[in-house]
């Protein structure tokens, strides 16, 4: 596997999105995003020391710092259910938000704006939550948003829940599996209607 510039940035910030730490997302993200004019990023699921502290030298907001460095002109937003995940830094702003609460999701979009270029769902990883969040937030975001759901174990279940959307599972190497060697670290790209 080729180590991309984004892989190196991800490793530097200790996010689990890079192959050297956990997932093989950053090589795919690099190819997908390297030529895109990304100005606004919103990631749901920031991570806390309780959930990510097993990664040596982990810092809260690791992936937000990765996006901030990779997109030097972008405003980066993060949202999480835990108050322990809140950080503020240059071009990074975080908000409390429960991905299963429609009103909180609407308030989040009111705060960050609907003109998000890249949205990543890295929150609870529960299929029902992933479907609910996509169905709730996609109509509030601009049509050409790049919407990615991470840590997908059963993409067919999510696709059924999002039947009105065009969903695509890109081919990436896998490092984590459910029983019967079914990958549980897939990505799902959802195209807004």
Describe these PLM feature segments:
Residues 1-149, 153-193:
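A short alpha-helical cap/connector motif
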């Amino acid at each position: 596997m080729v180590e991309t510039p984004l892989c190196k940035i991800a490793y530097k910030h200790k996010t689990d999105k890079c192959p050297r730490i956990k997932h093989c997302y950053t090589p795919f993200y690099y190819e997908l995003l390297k030529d895109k004019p990304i100005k606004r990023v919103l990631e749901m699921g920031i991570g806390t020391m309780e959930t990510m502290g097993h990664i040596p030298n982990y810092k809260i907001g690791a992936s937000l710092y990765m996006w901030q460095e990779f997109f030097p002109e972008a405003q980066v937003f993060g949202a999480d259910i835990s108050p322990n995940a809140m950080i503020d830094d240059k071009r990074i702003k975080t908000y409390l938000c429960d991905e299963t609460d429609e009103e909180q999701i609407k308030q989040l979009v009111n705060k960050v704006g609907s003109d998000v270029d890249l949205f990543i769902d890295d929150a609870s990883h529960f299929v029902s939550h992933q479907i609910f969040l996509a169905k709730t937030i996609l109509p509030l975001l601009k049509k050409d948003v790049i919407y990615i759901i991470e840590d997908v174990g059963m993409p067919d279940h999510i696709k059924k829940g999002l039947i009105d959307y065009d969903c695509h599972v890109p081919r990436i190497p896998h490092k984590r599996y459910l029983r019967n060697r079914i990958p549980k670290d897939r990505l799902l790209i959802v195209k807004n209607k």
